[in-house]
């Protein structure tokens, strides 16, 4: 069955699935098609965040349903540390 995944940019991705596919499998199909890593994807349907181990049937997702994908932002402040190092070096020049 065909489902649609809409991104926050408004792009709609078409994904071929089966009712027994897990959310994790759907995320992998999106990763293969769009290059978005599985661990950065959050899928939402009917206002609920979908869990990787559950199937599409568990959420009553049927053909031509639309899921919404948002990206999980990575934590950390690696960039800020880099800036601090640069500033520290500049102080000695």
Curated annotation (Swiss-Prot):
Keywords: Host-virus interaction, Isopeptide bond, Late protein, Modulation of host ubiquitin pathway by viral ubl, Modulation of host ubiquitin pathway by virus, Ubl conjugation, Ubl conjugation pathway. SMART domains: UBQ (SM00213). There is a cross-link at residue 48 (Glycyl lysine isopeptide (Lys-Gly) (interchain with G-Cter in ubiquitin)). SUPFAM superfamilies: Ubiquitin-like. GO terms for biological process: symbiont-mediated perturbation of host ubiquitin-like protein modification. PROSITE patterns: UBIQUITIN_1, UBIQUITIN_2. InterPro entries: Ubiquitin-like_dom, Ubiquitin-like_domsf, Ubiquitin_CS, Ubiquitin_dom, Ubiquitin_ubiquitin-like. Pfam families: ubiquitin. Residues 77-93 form a propeptide. There is a cross-link at residue 76 (Glycyl lysine isopeptide (Gly-Lys) (interchain with K-? in acceptor proteins)). Ubiquitin may play a role in viral life cycles, or in virus-host interactions. It is covalently linked to coat protein subunits of several different plant and animal viruses. Belongs to the ubiquitin family. PANTHER family: UBIQUITIN. This is Ubiquitin-like protein. It comes from Orgyia pseudotsugata multicapsid polyhedrosis virus.
């Amino acid at each position: 069955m065909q489902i649609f995944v809409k991104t926050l940019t408004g792009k709609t991705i078409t994904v071929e699935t089966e009712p027994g596919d897990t959310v994790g499998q759907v995320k992998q199909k999106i990763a293969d098609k769009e290059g978005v890593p599985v661990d950065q994807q959050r899928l939402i349907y009917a206002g609920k965040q979908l869990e990787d181990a559950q199937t599409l049937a568990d959420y009553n997702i049927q053909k031509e349903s639309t899921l919404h994908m948002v990206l999980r932002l990575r934590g950390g402040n690696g960039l800020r540390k880099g800036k601090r190092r640069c500033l520290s070096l500049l102080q000695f020049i």
